[in-house]
A protein has these predicted regions:
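Glycine-rich "substrate-gating" loop/helix at the edge of Rossmann-like oxidoreductase active sites
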Residues: 140-142
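Hydrophobic alpha-helical packing residues
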Residues: 26-27, 107
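Dinucleotide-binding Rossmann-like beta1-alpha1 core, especially the glycine-rich loop
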Residues: 52-126
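Beta1/beta-strand and adjacent pyrophosphate-binding region of the FAD-binding site
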Residues: 2-18, 35
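Short, flexible, mixed-charge acidic loops at enzyme active sites
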Residues: 46-53, 129-130
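Glycine-rich FAD pyrophosphate-binding loop
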Residues: 27-49
Length: 142
C-alpha cells in the first residue's frame, strides 16, 4: 500500500465506478494532486461496484442515458479494458417482455445493435437456464 500524503488538492473516497471515473476525468483535466481512498485493496475493495455484473446495457429509457453509456463503452475501449462479450436481459413476465420490446424500438431508432430472441436462443448460449420460465429476452452484443 502506498503511503498517504499529509494533504492533497482532491481526496476521492471510493474506488468504485464513480470514484474511478472522477479520478480519471480530473486527471484528464490536468489535475495531479489527487488521492483516492477505499476500504479495501484493489482491484476489489468490497464495495457495490465489485458486486455488479460489469455488463453494460446500452439502451435505457432515454437517449441521453444511452449516449452516456455508449460514451462509457468508447472510453473503456480506449483504455483497453473493455471485453465485448454480449449479454441477455431475460423476461419472465409479459410486463417485462413489453418493456424489452419498447427498448428494442429505441435501440433500432438510435442505431444501437440489439435484438429480441426466443427462450430457445437464450438456452443455446446459456444452457443452465430453464426455457420454460422465460418468455423471451433482449440480446445486446456489447
Amino acid at each position: 500500500m502506498a503511503s498517504l500524503p499529509s494533504s492533497a488538492r482532491c481526496v476521492i473516497i471510493g474506488a468504485g465506478i464513480v470514484g474511478n471515473s472522477l479520478a480519471y476525468h480530473l486527471a484528464e483535466l490536468g489535475w495531479t494532486d489527487i488521492v483516492q481512498l477505499d476500504k479495501g485493496p484493489l482491484p476489489n475493495p468490497g464495495g457495490s461496484t465489485g458486486h455488479a455484473s460489469n455488463f453494460i446495457f446500452p439502451v435505457d429509457h432515454s437517449r441521453e442515458f444511452a449516449d452516456i453509456t455508449l460514451d462509457s463503452v468508447r472510453q473503456y475501449k480506449e483504455l483497453g479494458v473493455f471485453t465485448e462479450s454480449g449479454g441477455y436481459e431475460v423476461a419472465r413476465t409479459e410486463e417485462r417482455m413489453e418493456e424489452l420490446r419498447r427498448r428494442m424500438s429505441s435501440a433500432k431508432a438510435w442505431g444501437i445493435p440489439a435484438e429480441l430472441v426466443t427462450p430457445e436462443q437464450v438456452v443455446e448460449k446459456v444452457p443452465f437456464l430453464d426455457p420454460s420460465v422465460i418468455i423471451g429476452a433482449a440480446w445486446f452484443p456489447t
